[in-house]
Swiss-Prot record:
This is Ig-like and fibronectin type-III domain-containing protein 2. One of its GO terms (biological process) is sarcomere organization. It is found in: Cell membrane. Residues 1-19 form the signal peptide. Residues 1437-1526 are cytoplasmic. Residues 682-724 form the WR1 domain. GO terms for cellular component: M band; plasma membrane. InterPro entries: Cys_repeat_1 (IPR006150), DB (IPR002602), FN3_dom (IPR003961), FN3_sf (IPR036116), Ig-like_dom (IPR007110), Ig-like_dom_sf (IPR036179), Ig-like_fold (IPR013783), Ig_sub (IPR003599). The keyword Membrane applies. Residues 20-1415 are extracellular.
């Protein structure tokens, strides 16, 4: 409950006792007349007591004589007799103050002791029975809780003499036990000053719960005397501490020694006792005092200077010197959406919050105090929530002490943006500090704290200071951004508010900019950024990320979430932009490519147009113009710059940036260029030749031999290059290298791969390493040979090692260096472990070489101990007799006749547990129910989970996960985790229905879900009872036989409410009769039954759903996963069947065409669904096609089977040479949907992109005979559309447009591992025949080539296609026609990119001699006529005097009004961080009338036309956009 409400309640209850220093007592009546002689009970306390939770009170009971029969009762139950409590009474809650007053005038007589007590009316004093005057049995109630409320009775035996008290405990709103850590003790001072016993609890708060304390009964003098003790007779004030603790100002009287009188408003101060006592206690601990005399002065436009004085020292802290200070500062946001000139009126006073009472409020008179209490705006803790709505955006401002949070919520997308304004701090040991990187013309709150070894002081007095206004030093630095905005077609209304960078926008303009003009930012941002990158400054000023696009001049649109930062950060953005004009250079100008080779580029540029004198260096960014290529960054470049190491015949894009000491420019115009192709064939059969620094190929001869590892091709000619060795080995010795390196003659015999290095040649180890290694990287082999880490530099660059330390590794070096020269097998690749069971696992790998005689398979334990070594002649092996739930690792080594190759990398796996039954999982939580419901918050609870499903007790902590879902507005479950058996769901939508269930988790084992309840988020709305499902007969194993008669009963506890009960089991649904609390279904078990679901609901829509799973002993059945499996040559195939049914250990086998299948191997796995059997065939051939049967034989001899057809195809080529991407382009697919067609690009999800308008085209281009239905199933393609994924027949009536992108993506994936493309196509023509040759990398993978050709310039002619497995082919063509030719490589995985070439027609056609001279004459005549005509047209075009019909078709290259097209620089923004833009469809020249058609060919949505009048600012056109003349 909120303290404010409690304060009003408490004030009402105590109104009769306030206003003066007198109190009125209610007498406590007895049921008998009090005589002067008989025993009777008396009290000074009232009969009705209202006391405060957490404090103590007393119930006085005094007997006018002595008796052992005085008994205390609570609510009729006895709790004590005499001065002793009963055993059932908690002494922590009660205490009896027992005292006896002896009447010595009557004297003493007789003797007494423990065994001989005195009689009634007497008390044993010094072993004598003395007459009693009175005996007190006062009951003290300690640490009051609500359980102590009730009726108390003090009674004399069983007589009618009694006292009754009614005790009412009020909620205090204070945290329990808050007083326990308060250490001060003013008990002696309080006793000396005569403070009332009812008030002495505040003199020593640590015992406040032990003694009677009633702050409402304390008088003015009590508080005066107590505060005199707490403030050392008024010499110390605690008011400042109370301010920092946010104690209301009308309670400051209790923080100083200047207490005047008790007022009605002081009643509210009860709820601030923890803060007040903490401040009183803090003064006597060695904390430092806060710094004083805080002075804050503005420096420049973005700094504040803060200075202070050292805090005063006291007796308590003089032994603890100040260690350092912390300066805290926070921006006071000016939020225009709230209206007003100053925006949000925050924290205008010292430590005050929105709505807090001002300091002078607590000084008013008694009559006015009541009005203060009634004012709803001055709650004890202040009003901390402010909500408002503007332009459809809800804004909520939440403040808690020193942090302010502004939240905007978009009702359309149901999303929020949060902005927090919290204090930042700077630590220092000085008494002055300068705060930098602040916002100009902005108010800040500043305070300082001091720290010593004991702790930190309270904050000092807060200061509010403003930074200075930012003034531009040089107006010449401001660009003409208004003209730029006008040229960019920004509306004049928005341009006047956004493009004038010389001044910050006003509050009213800010609201317009954030709402009406927000759509103009893509045009305005590049204009005001002016080629500079202001992002670093904006980040320092705390600009929110949604508005950082403005700082970088981005053309991205700002979403609705930017409304918040536009209102809060716009002034800081304009401040950074103005600073950048003075300190940041613009981008380099006139970037040009001056020289190109196959492997290098020369780039030149000029100085920036702005702030060129500030430039310190330039940075070059270059990358291939392909998706996903890495960016090469070259710093400190100087114009002209030569960049080497580029790939030949490749397209690149580069850009430059300028850097100054204070910032950087935006990227320059992106330059697109292509390196030259290599012009000197032949290329190396493997790898690339050696190139010189200038990009030219290195020429080798006898004088300039190739280095080790390379051979000189074409020796004796001018086309001799250094190419890598093509395979097996180059030599068995390296003596020539040793001679060149001046190896001593005594060590020359070691320069062979079958020799090692002797000890006498240790000092020549590095020479031997460099020659033997041939400069190749042998690190993998060295790691396998376990070469020590310091000595691994012999296996890679720089090929030098310390001789003394690494000489012992020579034998390992020799093994690795000689491996490349002995034709040993390569390391086995792609080792995979599959079909893992509790005692077996299958190991498979790639068989890449044909000369392997055997594979060695080694199995290791987790610690590395070798367990088994097996040999396999195939590329697969299965280990059996393994231990369950154990870690293993395996590696494979290939062996041929020359020896064994290096071992593969280890593959690790873990066998499955011996028992796959899920009995080790905890049971599902039960009795999920509502504890309380307040509407937006609901507390749900459940019974704890203590056992697992196998009845074992859980041994580890249980973590519960609660799931809840808004049934009307959400499809996403929200989760909460807890280790308790309850949780509070917060921020629920009022009056909404929610589904709720809970699961339990022990380690990584999760239970099934509990029953599902429906909660109505409505105050005091209880949940529905949980239904109970009982199934008879109750089989312990939970397994029922088909046809067995079962009875399923769903019932509810006895409640007085009509509820609907629906019991669903398979296809059976039964409902309860009106008023009945149960429903029964009697039926026979069948295979359709797997779950019994009982749902209880009421008229409000709430539900409680319970489920119970049924397991049926199914009839034996076997099904194939696919009826038809299409497989291509050299692929692998997996035929999968699933067996369900009774019986143990069924025998499963596969047959092919009626006979036992011989090629392949079987993988068998047992699951909850049954047995899954897979017949795996690697590298399928033609003879493997046919019908396969999965045959299952049970223990009783019954046999079931299912069949599937394997269809073999070698046709993997398309009908024309166009690839998928080309097909999509031809079909007109554009935008993001085109990415689905591109191999290597991230495929788009149909959930994120709407490509249904291209569905027909996508499905057409995705047509493929390959079977990729597994991928389609995983991508969510429905079964009716799966034929499109396997090349089967398909009904045109079925709509599969929603799956078009997924089907295309799967088709693309099947091509990603296709063969690489051919290279170096060579064409030789002779007498009507053309011989075509090409190069292809050496590989042992199966492949063939397809050659397409047709006549050039005839798009209507069909392509001719030929296939071959050789790297050449001969074509019959017409020698008088030009032909275009395309060649690709293909295998089972797909085909490569097409390599195009051309066949020119015969340049010397055979014609008759009689016609030759005549033809030549007419050719000359025609050429002369055309020459004269062309010259005339050229002259007229220069004079602009061409007739309209002719001029229309002649482009004027120098026309300044010629339309240009701008496209986005891919390198813009963060270097290379922008999205790529593909440019296709550039047409010829066009007039204004055809401009729209030309622009429609562009695929980017952000294209902008270059202004025809912006001739004076063309340099700025190169920042974000490049320009193409069309």
């Amino acid at each position: 409950m909120m303290r404010w409400r409690l304060a009003v309640l408490f004030l009402t209850l105590l109104a009769s006792t306030t206003g003066d220093d007198t109190t009125t007592k209610a007498s406590v009546s007895t049921t008998t007349k009090k005589g002067t002689d008989g025993p009777h009970l008396t009290t000074d306390d009232e009969g009705f007591l209202t006391v405060i939770q957490g404090f103590a009170t007393q119930l006085q009971c005094v007997l006018n004589t002595c008796s052992k029969d005085v008994i205390w009762y609570k609510d009729g139950s006895q709790i004590s007799k005499g001065s002793q409590f009963l055993n059932t009474t908690s002494e922590k809650a009660y205490k009896i103050q027992h005292s006896i007053e002896v009447d010595y005038e009557k004297g003493c007589s007789g003797e007494c002791d423990d065994s001989k007590p005195c009689g009634d009316g007497f008390s044993c004093v010094d072993n004598q029975c003395c007459s009693c005057r009175r005996e007190e049995f006062t009951l003290v109630l300690r640490n009051l809780t609500f359980d102590e409320s009730g009726r108390y009775r003090c009674q004399l035996g069983n007589k009618s003499e009694l006292l009754e008290f009614q005790v009412e405990v009020l909620e205090s709103g204070l945290k329990g036990g808050f007083h326990e850590n308060i250490s001060y003790d003013h008990s002696e001072c309080c006793q000396e000053k005569g403070i009332s016993p009812l008030c002495r609890g505040m003199c020593k708060p640590s015992e406040m719960d032990q003694h009677h304390f009633d702050p409402t009964s304390c008088k003015t003098d009590d508080y005066k005397h107590f505060l005199s003790c707490a403030t050392e007779d008024g010499t110390r004030s605690h008011v400042h501490c109370c301010k920092t603790q946010l104690v209301p100002s009308f309670c400051y009287d209790f923080c100083s020694g200047d207490f005047q009188m008790l007022r009605r408003s002081h009643r509210l101060c009860l709820y601030y006792l923890p803060e007040i006592f903490s401040c009183l206690d803090r003064a006597y601990l060695p904390y430092p005092d806060p710094p004083t005399a805080i002075e804050v002065n503005a420096v420049e436009h973005d700094k504040l200077s803060v200075c202070w004085k050292e805090p005063e020292k006291h007796e308590s802290n003089k032994m603890f010197p100040i260690l350092d200070y912390a300066v805290y500062f926070k921006e006071i946001p000016n939020f225009p959406l709230l209206g007003g000139d100053m925006g949000l009126p925050l924290l205008t006073g010292d430590y005050s919050d929105i709505g807090d009472i001002q300091e002078d409020d607590y000084q008013q008179e008694e009559d006015d105090a009541e009005e203060v209490v009634k004012d709803s705006t001055i709650a004890p803790r202040g009003k901390r929530d402010v909500d408002f709505e503007s332009d459809g955006v809800k804004v909520q401002i939440r403040e808690k002490r020193s942090t302010m949070v502004i939240v905007t919520r978009d009702d359309v997308t149901n999303s929020t943006t949060i902005r927090e304004f919290a204090f930042q701090n700077v630590n220092t040991t000085e008494r002055c500090v300068t705060l930098s990187d602040l916002r100009s013309s902005t108010r800040y709150i500043v305070y300082v704290t001091a720290r010593n070894e004991y702790g930190t002081s309270v904050p000092s007095v807060r200061n509010i200071a403003s930074t200075n206004v930012h003034m531009v030093k040089n107006n010449a630095s401001l660009p003409d951004s208004m003209k730029c905005c006008t040229d960019a077609n920004v509306t004049s209304f928005c341009s006047s508010k956004m493009c004038n960078v010389a001044e910050d926008p006003s509050s009213f303009s800010t609201i317009t900019i954030a709402t009406t003009c927000r759509a103009e930012w893509p045009k305005v941002s590049p204009c005001i950024a002016d080629g500079r990158n202001h992002t670093d400054c904006c980040l320092k000023k705390g600009v929110q990320h949604d508005c950082l696009e403005i700082c970088s001049g981005s053309t991205k649109e700002l979403g609705v979430h930017s409304v918040l930062c536009l209102n809060l950060d716009l002034q800081a953005i304009y401040q950074c932009i103005r600073q950048g004009y003075e300190t940041h250079p613009s981008a380099p100008g006139n970037v040009t490519i001056s020289e190109l080779t196959a492997h290098s580029v020369t780039v030149q540029w000029t100085e920036p147009n702005s702030n060129a004198h500030l430039v310190e260096n330039y940075t070059l960014f270059i990358r291939k113009n392909e998706h996903g290529e890495a960016v090469r960054t070259v710093k400190n470049v100087i114009s002209p710059h030569v960049e080497l190491g580029l790939d030949p015949d490749s397209e690149y894009v580069l850009t430059l940036q300028s850097h100054s000491a204070n910032g950087t420019s935006l990227p320059s115009t992106a330059k697109l260029f292509s390196t030259l192709p290599t012009t000197r064939p032949p290329l190396c059969t493997i790898g690339e030749p050696i190139y010189m620094n200038d990009g030219r190929v290195m020429i080798c001869d006898a004088v300039n031999p190739c280095p080790n590892g390379f051979r000189c091709t074409g020796a004796g000619s001018d086309l001799s290059y250094c190419c890598p060795h093509d395979g097996t080995h180059s030599s068995e010795e390296f003596t020539s290298c040793c001679k060149e390196q001046k190896m001593p003659e005594s060590c020359m015999s070691s320069c062979q791969y079958n020799m090692t290095l002797p000890e006498s040649c240790k000092e020549n180890l590095n020479t031997w390493v460099q020659c033997a290694s041939e400069g190749h990287d042998h690190l993998r082999c060295c790691l396998q040979e376990e070469v020590s880490k310091p000595c691994q530099t012999a296996c890679m660059h720089p090929f030098t090692v310390p001789a003394d330390e690494c000489f012992s590794e020579v034998s390992k070096y020799r093994t690795c260096f000689s491996a490349a020269h002995q034709a040993l097998p390569a390391a086995v690749r792609n080792v995979e472990v599959s079909s893992i069971s509790k005692d077996s696992a299958t190991i498979s790998w790639e068989d890449l070489e044909a000369n392997i005689i055997v594979f060695r398979v080694q199995l290791f334990e987790k610690g590395g101990n070798l367990i088994k070594t097996e040999n396999s002649s195939a590329d697969i092996f299965r280990f059996i007799d393994l231990e369950p739930n154990k870690d293993y690792s395996v590696r494979v080594t290939a062996i041929n006749f020359l020896g064994e190759g290096p071992p593969s990398w280890n593959a690790t796996f873990t066998t499955k547990p011996a028992q796959i039954y899920e009995g080790d999982r905890p049971v599902a939580p039960e009795k999920l129910r509502i504890s309380w419901n307040s509407g937006p918050r609901v507390n749900v609870t459940w019974d704890p989970v203590s056992v697992r499903r196998n009845a074992e007790v859980v041994t580890k902590p249980i973590e519960y996960t609660i799931y809840y879902l808004d049934t009307e507005q959400s499809s996403t479950w929200t989760t909460l985790r807890t280790n308790q058996t309850w949780v509070v769901m917060r921020d629920l939508r009022k009056d909404a229905l929610y589904y709720v269930y809970v699961t339990a988790k022990e380690d990584n084992r999760t239970s099934r879900s509990s029953s599902i309840i429906t909660i109505l988020a409505q105050k005091d709305s209880p949940g529905l009872p949980e239904p109970t499902i009982v199934i008879e007969p109750d089989h312990k194993d939970g397994v029922f036989s088909p046809g067995e008669k079962i009875s399923i009963n769903c019932s509810l506890p006895n409640i007085k409410k009509h509820l609907n009960i629906d019991l669903t089991v398979g296809s059976h649904v039964v409902q309860n009769d009106h008023g009945a609390l149960w429903v029964i279904l009697e039926t026979e078990a069948d295979e359709a039954m797997d779950t019994a679901t009982c749902a209880v609901s009421d008229t409000d829509g709430r539900q409680h759903v319970a489920m119970k799973h049924l397991v049926l002993e199914r009839k034996a059945s076997v099904t194939m996963k696919k009826d038809k499996i299409r497989v291509l040559d050299d692929q692998s195939v997996e035929i999968e069947c699933i067996y369900r049914g009774g019986g143990l250990d069924p025998k499963i086998s596969f047959e092919k065409d009626g006979k036992k299948a011989s090629r392949g191997f079987l993988n068998l796995k047992k699951t909850e669904a049954g047995y899954v059997a897979k017949w795996h065939i690697r590298k399928v051939k033609q003879e493997d096609a046919g019908f396969y049967k999965c045959v299952v034989t049970s223990s009783d001899g019954s046999r079931v089977e299912a069949s599937s057809e394997v269809i073999f195809s070698t046709e993997t080529l398309p009908v024309n040479p166009k690839l998928i991407l080309q097909c999509c382009e031809d079909e007109g697919i554009t935008g993001d949907c085109l990415q689905a067609c591109n191999i290597g690009r991230t495929s788009l999800s149909i959930k994120n992109q709407n490509c249904t308008r291209f569905a027909v085209s996508l499905l057409k281009c995705a047509s493929d005979i390959r079977d990729h239905s597994d991928c389609c199933i995983a991508s969510g393609v429905t079964s009716k559309c799966l034929p499109l994924c396997s090349g089967d027949s398909f009904s045109p009536d079925i709509d599969c447009s929603e799956h078009a992108v997924s089907i295309m993506t799967c088709s693309v994936k099947s091509h990603e591992h296709a063969p690489s493309e051919v290279s170096n196509v060579r064409i030789k023509a002779s007498e009507g025949k053309v011989n075509i040759e090409w190069d292809y990398p050496l590989t042992k993978d199966y492949k063939y080539f397809a050659v397409y050709y047709r006549k050039a310039h005839d798009d209507h002619e069909d392509w001719h296609k030929l296939k071959t497995i050789q790297q050449n082919i001969e074509l019959d063509v017409d020698p008088s026609e030009d032909y275009e030719v395309g060649i690709l490589a293909a295998n089972a995985l797909g085909h490569s990119r097409l390599m195009y070439s051309a066949i020119p027609k015969d340049s010397e056609p055979r014609r008759s001699a009689s016609k030759g001279s005549s033809s030549a004459f007419w050719i000359v005549v025609i050429l002369v006529v055309f020459g004269v005509l062309i010259a005339g047209l050229a002259v007229l075009s220069k004079r602009r005097e061409l007739p309209y019909p002719i001029g229309k078709f002649i482009g004027r290259r120098n026309d300044p009004n010629q339309p240009t097209v701008a496209f986005e620089n891919p390198a813009y923004g963060e270097p290379w961080g922008g999205a790529e833009v593909e440019i296709r469809g550039l047409g010829g020249s066009a007039t204004t009338g055809t401009a729209a058609a030309t622009q429609s060919e562009w695929q980017s949505a952000n294209l902008e036309a270059n202004s025809t009048t912006d001739n004076s600012h063309e340099y700025r056109n190169g920042m974000r956009y490049a320009k193409l003349e069309t």
